[in-house]
């Protein structure tokens, strides 16, 4: 009896353990599935709460074929039915690495799988620096948006990209405006014919980390294109990603990513408020009869010094685009530095004649 009883108890225990193991597996699968649904819910909430995009609109996705941009495309396709979006994909090939010519073929198959139209652009000249590549990509996106009437441009920037950009800006000595890193929503101003238009750029993945997207992409077995340049330690951003951030997590704070993301969000709010104030002040400029523009310099006597460069930068971007649209970012920046360093002047700076005294700043185009 004892032996049989012991055998029955042992058998029941083994059955109970087996059932408990099955329950644990089911619970794990359920939690994993819910976490995948959580990503989609966070993504849709970001579109709603941040006011990024409206329903029934045309949305162009800047896609590199990598994890972030393909996951962005997949999430948008999942919500496409409810939001009635019209989606399109554009791929910009910088010709920076060997094998990049194979990426468009893979991306074309991905777009065919999702039922999304796709376009490809190849750089006609050799791009040496990352900033040159970014400027070229923006020009391509502007041209595609204006030609095919895309109302929004969406990029795959994540919370991890935001943190890396914040650290990069801090390490190179940026102002509070630069510390706000990447924003949820920006606008891209471009010239189309004789009119200037503004195209919204949205980043709906800014609340999701790269690790969460990797798990999501692996769960759905999304077809991704591998970019070996992301492992190149000669690129500063990669050193921040693979060396600095792991060091900070290990030796400083395991939650450093969350804290830096909060810092980026707070500085973004503060900088947006400062920009609003400076924009209102900047509206005091006047156009003068000889085709020039003047700005009341005397207002700087009653304004904090920290706002001077912001106000001047907004003013220069507004005024010089009409005086000389080809002046460019670097030309505007050079004039900004020149104005901040001199008290009074009457001189020519490139194609712009500058006259500055205690009360007024005047600028005219030299013909």
UniProtKB/Swiss-Prot annotation:
The keyword ATP-binding applies. Keywords: ATP-binding, Chloroplast, Ligase, Nucleotide-binding, Plastid, tRNA processing. It is found in: Plastid, Chloroplast. The lineage of its organism: Eukaryota, Viridiplantae, Chlorophyta, Nephroselmidophyceae, Nephroselmidales. One of its GO terms (biological process) is tRNA modification. Its EC number is 6.3.4.19. The keyword Nucleotide-binding applies. GO terms for molecular function: ATP binding; tRNA(Ile)-lysidine synthase activity. This is tRNA(Ile)-lysidine synthase, chloroplastic. It comes from Nephroselmis olivacea. The gene is tilS. ATP binds at residues 64-69.
């Amino acid at each position: 009896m004892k032996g049989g009883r012991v055998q029955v108890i042992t058998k029941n225990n083994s059955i109970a353990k087996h059932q408990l193991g099955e329950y644990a597996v089911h619970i794990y699968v359920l939690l994993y599935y819910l976490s995948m649904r959580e990503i989609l819910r966070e993504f849709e909430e970001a579109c709603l709460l941040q006011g990024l995009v409206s329903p029934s609109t045309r949305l162009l996705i800047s896609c590199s074929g990598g994890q972030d941009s393909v996951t962005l495309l997949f999430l948008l396709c999942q919500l496409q039915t409810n939001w009635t979006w019209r989606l399109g994909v554009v791929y910009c090939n910088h010709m920076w690495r060997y094998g990049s010519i194979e990426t468009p073929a893979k991306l074309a198959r991905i777009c065919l799988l999702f039922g999304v139209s796709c376009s490809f652009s190849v750089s006609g000249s050799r791009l040496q620096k990352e900033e040159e590549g970014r400027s070229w990509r923006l020009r391509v996106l502007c041209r595609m948006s204006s030609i095919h009437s895309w109302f929004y441009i969406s990029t795959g920037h994540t919370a991890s990209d935001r943190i890396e950009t914040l650290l990069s800006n801090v390490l190179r000595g940026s102002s509070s405006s630069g510390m706000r890193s990447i924003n949820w929503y920006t606008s891209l101003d471009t010239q189309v014919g004789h009119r200037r238009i503004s195209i919204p750029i949205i980043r709906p993945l800014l609340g999701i980390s790269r690790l969460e997207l990797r798990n999501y992409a692996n769960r759905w077995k999304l077809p991704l294109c591998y970019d070996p340049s992301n492992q190149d330690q000669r690129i500063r951003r990669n050193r921040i990603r693979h060396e600095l951030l792991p060091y900070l997590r290990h030796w400083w704070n395991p939650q450093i990513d969350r804290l830096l993301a909060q810092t980026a969000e707070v500085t973004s709010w503060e900088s947006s408020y400062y920009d609003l104030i400076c924009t209102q002040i900047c509206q005091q400029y006047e156009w003068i009869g000889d085709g020039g523009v003047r700005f009341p310099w005397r207002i700087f006597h009653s304004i904090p010094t920290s706002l001077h460069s912001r106000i001047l930068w907004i003013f220069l971007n507004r005024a010089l685009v009409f005086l000389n649209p080809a002046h460019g970012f670097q030309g505007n920046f050079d004039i900004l530095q020149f104005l901040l360093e001199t008290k009074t002047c009457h001189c020519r700076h490139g194609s712009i004649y500058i006259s500055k005294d205690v009360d007024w700043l005047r600028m005219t185009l030299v013909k």
